[in-house]
């Protein structure tokens, strides 16, 4: 064999080892042991092979394919395997290494052949098959099925995720259709409980068990404390004597429990319903009866039972609905629905919150509506025909300059002329004559007709003072015991009026300083009733008050301003004997603020300002360790212990002279101030003198108030009367 032949044999042997049986061109030999092999023919330069049908149609570019079946791995090489020197190589390699040529899944059909030279497929007779579409192997179809399945699964997942996301977004941002629990909204506790809406406010009790109203025999009844707080505070209920009162300018309206009849001053009247019902000590007043004495309208609605009351009149904002919509408990689509409103319904606008407006419906729902559901808001004036009772007053045609005269015993009355001898410009003197002797309403009286005569001769009116201390009772509890009974108040008033008329005085000055918060409603009822008696008897009625503070609001300054002829603000005792720190009796700022606050409740024509004619000398020492440990409450916040002594103007000046101290002007407090060390501590004093008094008189004049009152006669320096005269006509 020549050299070329050797090389060719070596190449063929190598290929045989790699791919299986190989035949040279022109050879008719067949490899022994081959099962299912084809016939190898040679026609000229073209070699035709009858081989596995599974290879038909495979692209000449395919290099290999891997299938897995029953754990067996197969490798295939396409029919377009390399040809060198006209040799056609076709083989199968099983991972096990033996080429059997046996038919497997996709085994070749007999007579199939492939042509390598031309790239055209032919049949067994050499007919071209290029026009026939090639078949795909099962593995290719499986891959496509898997690919399609993956696509479908992906799309399904996208749809599911989208649906879940949509549900989440809807639940989070979509409008809630849930209805609010109206029984909870209105605070209804029992079947006969009546919900109450007053002036666009849902009224609930202080706790869950407090019933604000009841529907009884077809009539709405409102609980007494709710009536006082939200509708008309002039109604008064006495649980001790089971009587309800309403004070008119000339007398009381009185109603007994369970009755259709009532008395208006002296006239007997009746209704066709029971006016007052009770459960224990709790009273319920029929709303139609309340309406007789109150400027109000009301409407009753069902499901749930509720009554809508309007007692405030004036300008309001209203708007008409553009479309049907819901009123929600709060602003936002996730808030529960209170009620549904229709297109063209009118609502009252209470608050504007951009996208939502707080509104009140005519039937008593207070909630929120989308702004875009409302037409433009308009102003509307509301009113109701009603004649308010006129509580007439006595108004003196002069500026009041009243001085309190502290009278502790009958003998003190004899010094009245000496007491007023050095005064100038006084219009009124107020002796402390009347005190409550006991808890039955009896009084102690120091009234003297001689005193009155002396005062009248000096052109002074006499307004006798009635106090709830110094003379019998002297505690909050005792004052409450007297004022909380209608019969005891009546006894007290009748005795005072009788003593006043007997002595010939000109007025009553009420000075009750032991009124607790619990006693407030009884105290103001006493003021009403006493004002009626003073009005009927031509007596000037004035009432003394502390400087207005949040803790003494139960004195009802506004109601006093209606009932009384004059309201006096005692603008002193800023610091008292019981104070934990030293300070002024009446600094400028204290008096100024007191005037401002009082004017919020009382007309300036009725307001009189009390000023001090005294001061306090303070002595301040550091607390010992034992005293610090023993301190309780507010006292624990102060490191020093203080004591004080009240004294008049002249005595204060004498103290300064004895100490060799010069007081300096404090422009903040607008009074002279001094301090010095002695006796192991520090003395401090804020002087009340002509200079400080003038600053207070300027406030009174600038605010055009009714006048001034001084506490007390005998503590003043005589020079102050000329000063006061400049500010009092």
Question: Residue locations for each model-derived region?
Answer:
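SH3/SH3-like beta-barrel fold
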Residues: 246, 344, 357-361, 369
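Active-site groove signature of glycoside hydrolases
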Residues: 433, 491-522, 569-574, 578, ...
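Glycan-binding loop/region signatures in secreted carbohydrate-active enzymes
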Residues: 382-384, 471-472, 615-696, 728
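Primary recognition of N-terminal secretory signal peptides and signal-anchoring hydrophobic helices
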Residues: 3-13, 145-353, 382-395
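Conserved, mostly hydrophobic/aromatic
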Residues: 429, 510, 567, 609, ...
